[in-house]
Structures are given as structure tokens and as C-alpha cells.
Amino acid sequence: MSMQTAPIKKITLNHLQAKKNQEKIIAITAYDALFAQIFDPLVDVILVGDSLNMSFFNQNDTLNASVGMMLYHTKAVCAGAKIPFIITDMPFGSYKDEKTALKNAIRVYKETQASAIKLEGGKEKAKLVKTLTDEGVIVVGHIGLMPQFVRLDGGYKIKGKNEEQQKKLLEDALSLEEAGAGLLVLEGITTPIAQKITQTIKIPTIGIGSGKDCDGQILVWSDMLGFFDSFKPKFVREYLKGKELVQNAIKQYADDVKKGNFPNELESYH
């Protein structure tokens, strides 16, 4: 008689780390309870990303996202999604030193049901990662193209194109792993070095614009579903023409109202 595996009620870091070299991790962003509930049974990880500042608030970059903003949207996502591992981005300026980082990370844990926090930076952030993990906070690292450094870098630039960058990326990954990071996001990294990092470190890598060899993939939901069309990165694959579908539905609704076809008798009270 075969034993059936009980369904997972809540995905943990242990579940994700067990997928290393076994099964790809599926991750997506979400910013509210409605979409989090839709994504809930279909993904392993939901990132409440500071990307919301661009896709949700229509800003040019992520830099003026605030801790309050991230807490608000994380609470909403946690209300909608019960199964996935939920990661909250630490916004720009919220982890500038250990005291500030601890204060804000602890707020995330106390005020939301987030599973982990994510911060950008390489080996220079290793000491901070260790401090946070020593206090019981699960930290997700983020190296490569780092949106919070976009003004310093002069734009969104792919990393790993030369030997010096490749060496630094590998050193960054190893340092963050040693410091206690539970997962590592690789963004905008050339495929060969993303593959090497994934094969070298023991913790799972989640890629965005970093080739297919990472342990998992993440996309911004509004990019993937075709709602955000003002700019489309090379690495984005659209699985739906969401904006077009919604606009067509609104046009049909408006047409029905103008022609007196909505509401009809079945949609009215007597």
C-alpha cells in the first residue's frame, strides 16, 4: 500500500531549500490580497517587491518606496495568500546600518505574516545578513542588477559581462550564503555566471533575467500578464494580454450602459 504525501499547508524555507537540484521554484510578485489569493495555490513564493513603486504607483524607479508602504502591501498579500513563502522587500534606506535594519526587519515580522525579508547587496552586506539571521530573521539576498542602485549605475545594466564582474558576483554569492542567507535572487546576470553561482552555492537561486539554470524563476505579475506595457524587458514573456482584455470588458460594459442593456430585469430588484 503506497503512502500519499499530505498537501503542504504552508511553504517554509526548508521546503524551498529541499527543491535545490530537484524541482524548480515558482515565484511571482503580488501587492494586494486579490491577486495574492489568485496566485496562492499556484506558486511557491510571493515577493512583495518594492517594484510596486513602479508597477503599482507608476514611478520611474523603486527608490521612494517606504517601509510603511511595504508593510501595508505585505499585510494585504498575507491576507490573500496562505500557502506560499512570502518575502518582503526592504526598501531603499531601510537597512543603511545594523540598527536601522534590525528595527525595520523586526517590524516586518511583528506587523505582518511575512516569511522573510529581502535586501540588495553583495559581500558588503554579509555582516548585516548575519546580524539579522542571528536575531531569527530569514534573509533573502539579491545580487546582480540591483534596482536600488540604478541611479548610481546610470541605468539598468546587465552584470557578469566580464571576468572582473563574474568574480565579484561569485564572491558576493558565497559571502551571503556563509552569512546565513536562505535564498539568493540573481537579477540581470549573464547566463554562464548565473549557472556557475547556482552550481557552486548550496542555497537556492531565484533568477529574473538570469537565464534558465537558476533553481527558480520570478517575474513581476503585471509584466507577465500583460498589464504593464510602457516598457518590456527582454527577459519578460507575456502569458496574457491582460490590459487589452480588461479594456475590452470595460468598453462592453460602457456600451451596455449607454444602450440601456445594463442592468436588465434579472439584475434589478422589484
From Swiss-Prot:
Coiled coil: none annotated. Belongs to the PanB family. Homodecamer; pentamer of dimers. The keyword DNA damage does not apply. Mg(2+) binds at residues 50, 89, 120. It is found in: Cytoplasm. Pathway: Cofactor biosynthesis; (R)-pantothenate biosynthesis; (R)-pantoate from 3-methyl-2-oxobutanoate: step 1/2. Gene3D superfamilies: Phosphoenolpyruvate-binding domains (3.20.20.60). It comes from Helicobacter pylori (strain Shi470). It comes from the Bacteria. Keywords: Cytoplasm, Magnesium, Metal-binding, Pantothenate biosynthesis, Transferase. 3-methyl-2-oxobutanoate binds at residues 50-51, 89, 118. Its cofactor is Mg(2+). The active site is at residue 187. This is 3-methyl-2-oxobutanoate hydroxymethyltransferase. It is an enzyme of class 2 (transferase).
